[in-house]
Amino acid sequence: MASEMEKADALLHTFSTASAFSSLGLGLFCFVADRVQQATFIQQHDWLRALSDSTTHCVIGMWSWAIVIGLRKRSDFCEVALAGFFASIIDLDHFFLAGSVSLKAATNLQRRPPLHCSTLIPVVALALKFLMQLLRLKDSWCFLPWMLFISWTSHHVRDGIRHGLWICPFGNTAPLPYWLYVVITASLPSVCSLIMCLTGTRQLMTTKHGIHIDV
């Protein structure tokens, strides 16, 4: 577990000016990106609309993880890119459920595809954590469950403004208010980063990779 000094340091960094501006920028990006996607020339083309939507998911995932780790060395960009991949790859389950590469079929499903079940996020993150412990990878890859959790959660919350959250086995919530989506997305990296500090994940990342959490 993290020491009391590390916990205090986490609190100071979480509420730092840099964190506030980074989170504000993320929230502003969400707003601007959604407005851009409402442009007529995007809405008139299915593939362009799908591409812009996936790109927004990707950028939000990348931005969120960048807030968590900071961008101090070349390997950090690889982690940020991986977070963006996790955030956008979820939508491939549309094609899996449709059993077709047709975009029309993938976007006109009778039910939501499996990776859009929000209950899976903590389940998969915890399963990944236990698997890493079993394979003795918990130190070198301790960031991975958190990266997946943040990337997938940001995707689900953004989808939630249209469809609500699918909480198995209870069903779907009402669509999320837009302001709540922006607030959750902007604050999620800092909240998770703080929890990482309090649980000792930050310390492992620092000692193994020289990563300094910048929240």
Curated annotation (Swiss-Prot):
InterPro entries per UniProt: TMEM267
Membrane topology note: Multi-pass membrane protein
Gene Ontology CC: one annotated term: membrane
Chief location of this protein within or outside the cell: membrane
Keyword Transmembrane: yes
Transmembrane segments: 77-97, 114-134, 178-198
Record keywords: Membrane, Transmembrane, Transmembrane helix
Keyword Membrane attributed: yes
Subcellular location, record wording: Membrane
PANTHER family per UniProt: TRANSMEMBRANE PROTEIN 267
Protein name stated in the entry: Transmembrane protein 267
Species for this entry: Xenopus laevis (African clawed frog)
Originating gene: tmem267
